[in-house]
Amino acid sequence: MAREYIGKYIRWLNPHNPTRSYFLDRMQLSKPLVRGVGHHLYDVEGVEYLDFLSQYGAVSFGHNHPELWAALAACAQEQLPAMIQPLVPVAAQQLAAKLAAVTPGDLGITVFTNSGAEAVEAAIKLARARTGRPTILSTINGFHGKTLGALSATGNLTYQVLFGAPSPHFDYVPYGDAAALEAVLEKDADQIAAFILEPIQGEAGVIPAPPGYIATALELCRRHGVLSIVDEIQTGLGRTGALFGLPAEAGTPDILVLAKALGGGLVPIGACITTPDAWDHRFGALHSSTFANGNLVARVGLCALDILLRDDQQIVRHVAKNGAYLLQRLRELQAAYPRVIRDVRGAGYLAGLDFFPFDGDDSYTMAFFSKNDYLIAFFASYLFNVHHLVTAPVFNNSHVLRLEPPFTVGPAEIDRAIAALGALCDTLDRKDYYHLVRHLPGEAVTRVPGHRRFAAPNAPNPLPAPTQSVGPRKSFAFLVHYTELRDFVACDPSFTQFTAEELDRWRDWVQWSEPGLVYNLLQVRSRTGAVADGCLIGLPMLPADISRRGRRRMLPMLGDALTLAQSQGARIVGLGGFTSIVSKGAQSLVGKGVAVTSGNVLTTVMALEGIADVTRRLELSLPAMHTAVVGATGAIGRLASLLLADRVAGLTLIGNPRSRDALVRCRIVAGEIYARLMGRAKVTPPPVASPIDRQLREVLGPLLTTPLLRLTAAQVPLARALHEQRVVDDDGYERLARTVETAFAAAGRDAPIAFATDLRKAELPADLVFVATNSDASLIAADALTAGAVVCDVARPPNVAREVVESRDDVLVFEGGLVELPEPVHFGPNLLGFRPGIMLGCLAETVLLALEGDDRDHSIGPRLDPAEAEYLRVLAERHGVRAAPPHCCGVELGEEDFAKRQRAHAALRVELAVDKGDSATGRSVTGRSA
């Protein structure tokens, strides 16, 4: 499942195809099956499984058919030479004669191969030799094998591009479209050697040819002198309820290829069978294979044909009769679950169950499986582990379950399979996805599923209105991950059934998934009429998981997420949560072929607009509020400090207590603030200057504007230091901050910016607390906050402990950085449960840039620019993007919440006024001064 990560952060050293073995192990499909009898398989513990796959149709007669083994045993008894090329293989000649007798028309010359893909290769070579033309025409989504020529004829780029396929001279037409075929033949027949097609496109989703299509196609080929190749590797020899899938009215193709059932499930063998007119002696002289034409495999092939033809093809008639019953039962299942099963297709014992895709509205987990081509593998895992039914996906359609049982199954086995599929469909219909995934972490399933029905968190977004496309497509992608354990349930309501232990195992399992699509938003509209579309790319892990994995192992994963975003057409990619942190505010991902943003600038801007709204509703004066910024040296905390300095009475910058240079780093931020404000101290003050600005003007203004000769002896060194200050790096900012502090001390005043590493130890109580750390822990407890404090918590997950909300009615806590779009769109469960239209600022910045068509990098690194903040603020205003109403713990705050805070704070003030002792000490009942 994590193919690209082997060697990056997953060490999976199985010597037998580690990629596939990792996938099978991860999907709980690696259980050793040690015994097979008929249509039953058994594991090492003796548990029985019903085989409804028969190795993609190769085990048509069931496992270990006694007659087939007897044919092999007879070879040993007779001491028949197994391989004697270039001499005459007697059994191979006998098998060729028998095939000539049973195949349609005058198909009578056989070249044996070791597999179906090699049979297709032989057919391609023969057609080119016979016609002298290079081009092989095949169908879109056809499947003919994985050797290079057969792969080139396979009309699916997924399997081709890595291997330099398709090779030159391959072309494709839509399957079932005779008019398209005729048009190509009319135009290019003189270059086309052959047209290859399947009676049923098995790997495309078990798609039967439209009535009359095969006959028309073969007739068109005859008319234009192009050879026809019918690929019956999967459909031939009884699979469809007839000896061949080729309709009788179609006539005889020039070449027919067989494999799978011909080997009886014991030996690999393929056959390229041609008419005399299509045969070419040059091909016969030059084409050979060391291991083909062996007597051993030919004896098995002869026995397989005997079983098929016995009693007037009794086993084939059995497949026809019971295949009709299988399709009937599947269609009954579709009728019972019309929201689950999209279609049922097939013939005989080759059936496809086509499931509706999952869009993410009701489950990010199911959308992750669905959008990233793992849905049917996941269903097959559930059926195997819970119901002991062996199935598999088709190769070219990630939503079709293949049902391809051995010919030996009857009505009882079909009913058992339908019961298992019914349980799957019922669970899907009830959205009880917990009961589908709980086996994946390796838990033995013991609890019986209930019958609870779960609802999607949001109704689907309305279909987008038609728009007139102007200019390039505006598209974005955004990387998301879980922020708290409760997010697992928010995204998948049925996960409430997980026990704590189960959820822990699920978390551990899912975190090793590669980045994958979880939601597609078809349209988001600006107030200007601009339109963009986008997608969410999920990294299903918690912040602690990302932190443990570290930058070295996370960056390749994020690089793959960017590649996925580009494949979806994204022009800007936003980094949510800890994906921004681990990439140094997107700095490590710049220059990777697509624009990136950490989203930190708009998050900060909207957090400050939220503060303005909350303080207005509480009738508080922001310029009178001393403000603490917790996480002041981080990207958001630093930018917020720079911008808040224009609005509040004073600042306390709180650094990381675990960092030895925390106070130095805080002083550097203070130096940046002072440098920004000092330029204003030399000019006429604005009509409304901030308190910090006024203080700097009062203390530094004289030092900056008064000639040195008119200053006191004590002032001269400070004035010279300020004039000579050259701020070009962190050391310069730190020196500037120290100079400002000295100047304020000389004036007998405290500097307007203080520092601490703990909110409790700050010199001044904070009326407003802005929290924006990179920690995934709760850092702000109830006893750290002054009475009546307002707390803006930007951190994800929140840094303010839930007990603050539950125990401190006098304190108002709200989630900072939330944004409201002009229209109420959502991204499925919206992860954090907000109502449609409301989202995190980092996501909103990504959407905003897409709407604007701005595909430059933004919000990069730790030093965010106030000028960029102003640019995005103006952009947001133009497009109708604004700060969301304040929320706390995912719930929108109402007027009663504000009134409750006012009442509680007023009661505390009365209590403090009455309590003389506390008044004397200046301490409140909370342990912080009022």
Residue ranges and their predicted role:
Residues P472-R473, D492-T499, L503-W509, S513-C535, ...:
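Adenosine-phosphate binding glycine-rich loop
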Residues R616-P765:
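Glycine-rich phosphate/diphosphate-binding loop of Rossmann-like nucleotide-binding domains
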